Design a protein with these regions (language model features):
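Juxtamembrane helix-loop boundaries in multi-pass membrane proteins
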Residues: 64-97, 109, 113, 133-163, ...
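A generic, well-ordered mixed alpha/beta core segment in the N-terminal half of proteins
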Residues: 166-202
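Membrane-interfacial loop- and helix-cap regions that link adjacent transmembrane helices
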Residues: 236-238, 245-250, 257, 264, ...
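Internal transmembrane alpha-helix with an interfacial aromatic "cap," most often the third helix
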Residues: 164-168, 195-207, 231-241, 267-284, ...
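Membrane-proximal N-terminal segments immediately preceding the first transmembrane helix
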Residues: 50-67, 84-100, 129-135, 169, ...
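Intrinsically disordered, low-complexity terminal tails of fungal membrane proteins
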Residues: 1-66, 442
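C-terminal functional regions that serve as terminal interaction/effector modules
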Residues: 124-126, 340-364, 381-442
Length: 442
């Protein structure tokens, strides 16, 4: 019997030979390969489970959408909705400025005025409800690149309502309303200056607006300043119609209005210069920004309307001893002529911007153009700046006794009322179809 070899398997171990070493290495490699394979399968299974969970969650969101209540819709309300009151009050202003007067025209103007009052209070209530339902949304609205520019629309709406009160209320009421409107004029003027400067300071301190995104909407914070002269002109004119000129301090009102109007026009003119530069370097704004081009009409149109009206009332504004005794009659003539010529110059600029604004929409009238612009509240820019152009047209026509220009203004007034009606009906339709005041998809 032969003794067992050293390191034999019978003793529980074996000396490493060429064959045993190969088997050991092969076993280790197989184990490692199996381990990596199991890890890969486990990772693949995890990815598949995650993808499946994601798919299920998407299906659940699609099949069972979140219910949107009235509070959710109110939370979507923004400052831009005050453009509707600007436009509606502007239409009432134009109807009061039509030179060919009739009882039915006065009634239609009063209807627009009262409807605008209701619309303004409704917008104010809904906006306050939004701020209450969404804490922090008030502060956020001042730093939003889009919404912050439309905050002054609320103040412009108030100014438009005050102008309508001068046109429709003061001639029918006693001196008490005239005195009240005089006090409100000074309050509103101070508020317009402070809010306009404050909004621009907030924007310049917190936001950056690249020049390639520039639109005339940047002028909007200056708009409260631009209706100061029309406000003063209608206030003084209403005192003349009511026969209470002695009740009103017309000269300080007119002087302050000219100063503030010049402030707003110069500021707007500089901003519009940047807009022309943007047009030369970046072409016209995008489709969704295109309605805002009409805002460029407002600065020169409001200034022309206000200055010409104040100049025409110079005989009622200037006292007998104005600046130099015995020179009042000469001063009245000079101011009437100067205001009419400056107004005509600015009116021409407004007409030019009107032609550019209309021309920017020419491509949408072509049959081969299929793209459509979704409705938004900035569509009221089609109306409000053009109300300024029409009131300026009437003032120019009255200053130069130009009957053909008055007839052209009347024809454009009818067209403007039609445009307002189409936009307002479209707004109601979009609210009903959940295209407005509806949470956007994330």
């Amino acid at each position: 019997m032969t003794p067992p070899r050293p390191y034999s398997t019978g003793l529980g171990y074996e000396s490493p030979t060429e064959h045993t070493v190969d088997r050991t290495v092969t076993s280790d490699m197989a184990a490692n390969h199996l381990f990596h394979r199991l890890s890969e399968l486990e990772q693949t299974q995890r990815r598949q489970n995650a993808a499946l969970d994601n798919l299920v969650s998407k299906v659940e969101k699609t099949d069972v959408p979140k219910a949107v209540g009235i509070k959710d819709r109110i939370a979507c309300f923004q400052w831009t909705w005050f453009t509707s009151t600007m436009a509606t009050g502007g239409v009432a202003n134009v109807l009061a400025s039509v030179p060919f007067r009739s009882q039915w025209l006065y009634i239609v103007g009063v209807i627009f005025f009262v409807f605008n009052l209701c619309l303004f209070f409704m917008n104010t209530a809904l906006l306050l409800a939004r701020f209450r339902l969404r804490p922090g949304s008030f502060r956020h609205s001042f730093t939003d690149k889009f919404e912050s520019l439309f905050i002054p629309a609320s103040l412009v709406s108030i100014g438009t309502i005050l102008i309508n009160i001068c046109q429709y209320g003061v001639p029918k009421a006693g001196p008490w309303l005239l005195t009240t409107m005089e006090a409100l004029f000074w309050i509103w003027t101070v508020a317009a200056i402070l809010i306009s400067a404050g909004i621009y300071l907030i924007l310049w301190s917190t936001l950056i607006f690249p020049i390639h995104t520039m639109t005339p909407v940047w002028v909007f914070p200056a708009y409260p300043l631009l209706i100061t002269a029309p406000f003063a002109g209608n206030l003084i004119n209403s005192s003349v119609k009511a026969g209470h000129t002695s009740t009103l301090n017309a000269l300080p009102i007119a002087m302050a209005a000219v100063a503030v109007q010049g402030m707003g026009f110069c500021l707007s003119f500089m901003i519009l210069a940047a807009f022309v530069y943007r047009l030369m370097t970046q072409k016209l704004p995008r489709d969704m920004q295109r309605p805002g081009v009409f805002i460029s009409i407002g600065p020169s149109a409001f200034t022309a309307a206000g200055l010409v009206q104040l100049g025409g009332l110079a005989g009622e504004i200037l006292p007998d001893d104005f600046m130099m005794p015995g020179m009042t009659s000469h001063a009245v003539f000079i101011l009437k002529l100067l205001s009419a010529m400056i107004g005509l110059w600015l009116w021409g600029l407004a007409v030019w911007f009107f032609l550019v604004s209309v021309g920017s929409f020419w491509k949408y009238a072509r049959p081969e153009h299929e793209a459509k612009i979704g409705f938004q509240m900035t569509f009221f820019s089609f109306v409000f700046p053009n109300t300024a152009l029409l009131t300026a047209t009437y003032q120019i026509a009255n200053a130069f006794s130009c009957r053909p220009l008055q007839i052209v203004g009347c024809a454009m007034t009818g067209l403007l009322v039609l445009v307002w009606a189409v936009i307002f009906v479209t707004m109601i339709r979009c609210i009903w179809k959940r295209e407005l005041l509806w949470p956007k998809e994330e």
